[in-house]
């Protein structure tokens, strides 16, 4: 049977781990609040620019932009948004699984791929899968700016315009709630025409462009792509902190359960030890009295 000293050592070790996981849980809660507030504050702009693009696509365009061209697909590009650190459950695993399904499907159709990875975890994982990593971006801070993403966005758009990629996808974790995060893969380019209902069709209109409509359209569409990527990274950061908070809470709860079980075991061993000592003392006293 395990001794009292070993049980005490285990309890001390688990208690130290519990303190660490509890501290990490509290840190994640604090970070989650800050990033979630930032994500929510940017959503109105995100929703409005989506509405603008929907109306632009359904309207009668004076200039048909390259971003709307449907091509024969020979090569795709995928922007993958992951985390830099672990301890966030299966957040990255589920996303990578979804991306691999899409990549495998295209490879089976002899379609090549180019990857743009954000986060150390995606870079480490997809390095073992393909050599076609065009651009990688790691160690983004929680207070990152859209300018930090511009080089990657510029390269991906230039590759699409020049015909080096025919479709551009964006893979990230979508935040639904603190408990539910959904691995999501959306097509960025070519921009798809939205499916509108009867009520929405009646609300569509054409824009009147002042000055050069071609230049204005190009600026709006580029801003739309930029903000899609920016918002996806914000959502992924929120998902990361929510997943880490839940993972650390689970670890803390498991530590408490282990400590409870060890405490009971400790009490039993100690009780057995005391009983044995008392028995030995009584037996010794009885032997002395007989002599």
UniProtKB/Swiss-Prot annotation:
Which residues pair up as cystines? none
Q: Where is the protein found, in the record's own terms?
A: Cell membrane
Q: Which domain of life is it from?
A: Bacteria
Instruction: Describe, as the record does, how this protein assembles with itself and its partners.
Output: F-type ATPases have 2 components, CF(1) - the catalytic core - and CF(0) - the membrane proton channel. CF(1) has five subunits: alpha(3), beta(3), gamma(1), delta(1), epsilon(1). CF(0) has three main subunits: a, b and c.
Lineage, please?
A: Bacteria, Pseudomonadati, Pseudomonadota, Gammaproteobacteria, Enterobacterales
What membrane topology is given? Answer: Peripheral membrane protein
Q: Which UniProt keywords apply?
A: ATP synthesis, Cell membrane, CF(1), Hydrogen ion transport, Ion transport, Membrane, Transport
A GO CC annotation given for this chain: plasma membrane
The biological process GO terms on file are: proton motive force-driven plasma membrane ATP synthesis
Q: Name one Pfam family in it.
A: ATP-synt
Q: Please give the chief subcellular localization of this protein.
A: membrane
* Protein name according to UniProt: ATP synthase gamma chain
* Signal sequence range: none
Question: What GO molecular function terms would the record report?
Answer: ATP binding; proton-transporting ATP synthase activity, rotational mechanism
């Amino acid at each position: 049977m395990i001794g009292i000293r070993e049980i005490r050592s285990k309890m001390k070790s688990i208690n130290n781990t519990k303190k660490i996981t509890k501290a990490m849980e509290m840190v994640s809660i604090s970070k989650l609040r800050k990033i979630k507030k930032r994500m929510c504050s940017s959503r109105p702009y995100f929703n409005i620019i989506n509405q603008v693009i929907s109306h632009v696509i359904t309207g009668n365009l004076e200039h048909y932009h390259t971003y709307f061209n449907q091509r024969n697909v020979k090569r795709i590009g995928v922007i993958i948004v992951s985390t830099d650190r672990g301890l966030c459950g299966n957040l990255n695993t589920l996303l990578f699984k979804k991306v691999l399904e899409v990549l495998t499907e295209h490879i089976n159709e002899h379609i090549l791929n180019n990857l743009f990875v954000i986060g150390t975890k995606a870079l480490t994982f997809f390095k073992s899968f393909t050599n076609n990593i065009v651009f990688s971006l790691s160690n983004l801070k929680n207070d990152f700016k859209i300018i930090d993403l511009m080089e990657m966005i510029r390269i991906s758009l230039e590759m699409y315009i020049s015909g080096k990629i025919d479709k551009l996808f964006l893979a990230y974790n979508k935040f639904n709630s603190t408990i539910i995060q959904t691995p999501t893969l959306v097509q960025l380019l070519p921009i798809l025409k939205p499916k509108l209902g009867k009520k929405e069709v009646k609300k569509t209109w054409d824009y009147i462009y002042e000055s050069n409509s071609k230049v204005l359209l190009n600026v709006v569409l580029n801003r739309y792509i930029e903000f899609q990527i920016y918002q996806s990274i914000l959502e992924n950061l929120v998902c990361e902190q929510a997943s880490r908070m839940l993972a650390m809470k689970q670890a803390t709860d498991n530590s408490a359960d282990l400590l409870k079980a060890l405490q009971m075991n400790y009490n039993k061993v100690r009780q057995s030890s005391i009983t044995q000592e008392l028995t030995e003392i009584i037996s010794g006293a009885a032997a002395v009295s007989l002599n």
